[in-house]
Amino acid sequence: MSAPIVDAPAAEIVYKIISSDGVVSKMSEKAVQQSKTLSNLIENLGYTIENIETRDPIPVTNVNGKTMAKVAEWCEKHKADAIPEDNMNVLKTLTIPEWDQKFLKIEDEALFDLILASNFLDIKGLMYFGCKTVSNMAKGKTTAELREIFGINTDEQDAAEETAQRAAAEVA
Amino acid sequence: MWPRNDVHMDDGSMTPEDQEPVTDNDMEYNDNGEESSYSNGSSSSYNADKLSSSRPLQHKLDLSASPSRNNDLNPRVEHLIALFKDLSSAEQMDAFTRLLQESNMTNIRQLRAIIEPHFQRDFLSCLPVELGMKILHNLTGYDLLKVAQVSKNWKLISEIDKIWKSLGVEEFKHHPDPTDRVTGAWQGTAIAAGVTIPDHIQPCDLNVHRFLKLQKFGDIFERAADKSRYLRADKIEKNWNANPIMGSAVLRGHEDHVITCMQIHDDVLVTGSDDNTLKVWCIDKGEVMYTLVGHTGGVWTSQISQCGRYIVSGSTDRTVKVWSTVDGSLLHTLQGHTSTVRCMAMAGSILVTGSRDTTLRVWDVESGRHLATLHGHHAAVRCVQFDGTTVVSGGYDFTVKIWNAHTGRCIRTLTGHNNRVYSLLFESERSIVCSGSLDTSIRVWDFTRPEGQECVALLQGHTSLTSGMQLRGNILVSCNADSHVRVWDIHEGTCVHMLSGHRSAITSLQWFGRNMVATSSDDGTVKLWDIERGALIRDLVTLDSGGNGGCIWRLCSTSTMLACAVGSRNNTEETKVILLDFDAVYP
């Protein structure tokens, strides 16, 4: 990064990120630092304050636009936060702040995509909150409740369905 | 799906009906056409075109359809779906709403079952394993057991050792490997005329259980060792709390005498007696290994060194003797005390002994050398604790003294008790001392405080002598000659629970597991308590002679075994040690 102009405050860089489906999201420089993958990508591809305006958006081919928008929103909210230590014990003592609890109160499909994205983009804070959210869905539940919450058949039901499909295939 | 199949069957089986449905479809189609023209007045020409093009197509299908196709498709449903596809998203939503209003609850429930999976995700099966592990990392062992029952995939992920290893110390309590406890005295049981063990397994079930006990490492251990460890620890806890007692034994010795002291180290049990001897027993084999002969007076106190190599005993003959656990040989006789050796404590190979001669002496048991004499008490020393540097002693002079073991200097004298001090606890890390006295009170001291201000709590409520105490964190458990167990918060200085049930003096106490305390009593019983709920869990041993002289003098325990020293002062009960087994195998 170049030195800021002496007489004017440095403008913060805003990066454009293009997702797998062609949707463009924006993230500030500070927000991007929450993601080790994005930070490395920006550095390796040579995006700078001088050339950012003239270059194509940063390509992230593993994440769709809807999910990337959520990621960007989370990173902007937490851009001033320290990145949590890479330590399993952090997870045990972690409590999810209220804003994040609301942010993560989304459908399973969206939460699933968000956790995958946080893993790919190496956003530890979001990954921990996402995993903790799923943990909290499972905590203190009976086996039957777990199946109902996560939409999982018993192995017997799966076996019966497979048998039925095989029988149907033979008839056809 | 099923109702639709049903309709199909009806359709296919009635040839005369084939014509009527066609007629019905035509009528319904006209109705829908009318509706369409109402809701889309501006595009009536388009609808008219649709109508004219659809009609011939439907007609063609009707004429050319084979009987099997007729069975597969319900023309009315197909028409409905075709119309539905032509609707806008908003129109579809309106149609859904109105269809639901026309549906019965059975169909609505089936509809929910079809829809719900669209909103659910099987996270553990679909996420990368390392993320699944992060999710499971937050769960308790109990939760993990439930997770394992959900599906094959969940079971595989839930059994990854790293997840179980990460459980906290509270959950992942380590026990020594499973024991045999089927030979020697274990071949019988402790159940006998005059001895009741209320929840003991029936004799006819013992042989099967003994066989199963020897299968020490099961299937789960082979594929998920740490889960197996968790399950075993959980089983052991249940064995103490609720399960039938699956094994017991009687160690007979010290006939017609009192067992005055008892210690356990790993698999070694040492009992001392006023018959002038100590016996060294192998717990798992259920047999005596050595009888330590040499004292010329009753043995009143003993210790096993932390390394397990030395047994030390104190006697009315004024001597301290050091014995080898390897072969029971006498290594040293330590002389110097001028009266009964009444109490002792060890740290490493350094021993501190307290005596009726009012002094404490410091020894090295390896070399047999006398290192220091601590003068200061004005009456018998009754109890002592030692952390390797600091000695804490309580005496019949009503005081508790703090000493430096190396210099022999008395650092502090704690005054406040107005009768003899009988029991002590010392927690070195916090400089906390708890003392129990015949004045009925328990005092909690912090001797780093300014002189005269050391007493941080005065615990009152007991009405007699406190015979034993144990402290964890801020919770102190005390047992007393008044027949009660009390649970205290030493930070608040309050009594949290009073546990009643014994009918005479409590002689000993053992705290194991998270919240379980066992107590022995002059009333001839051993009771197990839950000190968190403040309730009796169950009686473990009951002597018929209780109340007539039979008593339980002392308890010792490991995490899987309880030893009870039994006897009487009037020969109504033979002297023996009853062992109860609470062990379990790795599933």
Swiss-Prot record, chain B:
It holds the Pfam family F-box-like. Residues 17-34 have a biased composition (Acidic residues). SMART domains: FBOX, WD40. Expressed in tail and head neurons. Gene3D superfamilies: 1.20.1280.50, YVTN repeat-like/Quinoprotein amine dehydrogenase. Changing residue 567 to E: In n1074; masculinizing phenotype. Does not self-interact in vitro or bind to skr-1 protein. InterPro entries: F-box-like_dom_sf, F-box_dom, G-protein_beta_WD-40_rep, WD40/YVTN_repeat-like_dom_sf, WD40_repeat_CS, WD40_repeat_dom_sf, WD40_rpt. Residues 35-47 have a biased composition (Low complexity). Residues 121-167 form the F-box domain. One of its GO terms (molecular function) is protein homodimerization activity. Keywords: Cell projection, Cytoplasm, Developmental protein, Differentiation, Repeat, Sexual differentiation, Ubl conjugation pathway, WD repeat. GO terms for cellular component: axon; cytoplasm. It is found in: Cell projection, Axon; Cytoplasm. SUPFAM superfamilies: F-box domain, WD40 repeat-like. Disruption phenotype: Worms show a weak masculinization phenotype. Moreover sel-10 mutants suppress the egg laying defective (egl) phenotype of the sel-12 mutants. RNAi-mediated knockdown results in increased zyg-1 expression at centrosomes. GO terms for biological process: cell differentiation; female sex differentiation; negative regulation of centrosome duplication; negative regulation of Notch signaling pathway; regulation of Notch signaling pathway; regulation of protein stability; regulation of vulval development. WD repeats lie at residues 253-291, 294-333, 336-373, 376-415, 416-455, 461-498, 501-539. Probable substrate recognition component of SCF (SKP1-CUL-F-box protein) E3 ubiquitin-protein ligase complex, which mediates the ubiquitination and subsequent proteasomal degradation of target proteins. Regulates synapse elimination in early development in the motor neuron HSNL. Cell autonomous negative regulator of lin-12/Notch-mediated signaling, with respect to lin-12 activity in cell fate decisions and tumorigenesis. May target the intracellular domains of lin-12/Notch proteins for ubiquitin-dependent degradation. Involved in sex determination by promoting female development. Probable component of the SCF(sel-10) E3 ubiquitin-protein ligase complex which includes skr-1 and F-box domain-containing protein sel-10 as a substrate recognition component. Interacts with fem-1, fem-2, and fem-3. Interacts with the intracellular domain of glp-1 and sel-12. Interacts with lin-12. Interacts with skr-1. Interacts with zyg-1. This is F-box/WD repeat-containing protein sel-10. It comes from Caenorhabditis elegans.
